């Protein structure tokens, strides 16, 4: 059949012309040729594109740069700020996984959400200055919509209680030095980072001054700083009166 087509049609015709002439169907993707036909035939079969070739082409276009060597997203003023931030972060991390050095606790994350609800005009940069973290950390916290259920909250409280009991046992067994018999356990709400200059609210634990007849030096030679400071202030007052 193919030899008959070769006699009727010129050898310069392409595969598309054969299909258009009705000799070959359009849906065929392969030809079965004899050895003589492979030698004598000048018909070139179009190469079928490989799988994933289009995806690689799209990635190449996305990674294309202009003549100055800068990425195209830098000069594209139509991009929104969040997308520019995403491109900048991807370029900064060099394709690595997001893993910040400083991580906020669960309470500090709730503080970030509380700040955004109470002060909607504050941007991610403003909150980041308060918490001493990068704006990307604040953006990811505000973007997350996950909230623990009641069962998860109970599990969190149970794990924290178990952890505090374990630490208390370490103190009592003498495995941790400096145990004084009382471990102040207080919960505090801090709106701002631990080293932030502007702290909106902080609840400090109350200091246990102990009995009034407490000695300056106890059996373990521990110095009572509060009593020493009070004694020095008393001497200064007496000198002023004299």
Curated annotation (Swiss-Prot):
It is found in: Mitochondrion. The keyword Transit peptide applies. Transmembrane segments: none annotated. Residues 1-20 form a transit peptide. Keywords: Mitochondrion, Transit peptide. GO terms for cellular component: mitochondrion; nucleus. Belongs to the RRG9 family. This is Required for respiratory growth protein 9, mitochondrial. It comes from Kluyveromyces lactis (strain ATCC 8585 / CBS 2359 / DSM 70799 / NBRC 1267 / NRRL Y-1140 / WM37) (Yeast). The lineage of its organism: Eukaryota, Fungi, Dikarya, Ascomycota, Saccharomycotina.
């Amino acid at each position: 059949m193919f030899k008959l087509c070769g006699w009727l049609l010129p050898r310069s015709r392409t595969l598309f012309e054969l299909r258009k002439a009705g000799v070959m169907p359009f849906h065929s993707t392969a030809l079965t040729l004899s050895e003589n036909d492979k030698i004598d035939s000048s018909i070139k079969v179009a190469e079928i594109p490989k799988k994933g070739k289009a995806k690689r082409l799209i990635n190449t276009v996305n990674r294309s740069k202009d003549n100055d060597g800068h990425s195209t997203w830098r000069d594209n003023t139509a991009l929104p700020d969040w997308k520019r931030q995403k491109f900048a972060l991807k370029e900064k991390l060099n394709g690595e996984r997001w893993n910040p050095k400083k991580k906020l606790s669960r309470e500090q994350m709730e503080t970030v959400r509380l700040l955004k609800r109470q002060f909607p005009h504050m941007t991610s940069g403003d909150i980041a200055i308060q918490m001493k973290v990068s704006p990307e950390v604040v953006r990811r916290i505000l973007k997350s919509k996950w909230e623990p259920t009641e069962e998860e909250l109970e599990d969190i409280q149970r794990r924290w209680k178990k952890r505090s009991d374990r630490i208390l046992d370490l103190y009592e067994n003498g495995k941790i030095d400096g145990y004084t018999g009382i471990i102040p356990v207080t919960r505090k709400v801090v709106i701002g980072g631990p080293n932030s200059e502007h702290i909106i609210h902080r609840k400090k634990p109350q200091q246990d001054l102990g009995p009034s007849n407490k000695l300056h030096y106890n059996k373990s030679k521990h110095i009572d700083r509060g009593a020493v400071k009070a004694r020095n202030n008393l001497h200064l007052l007496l000198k002023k009166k004299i």
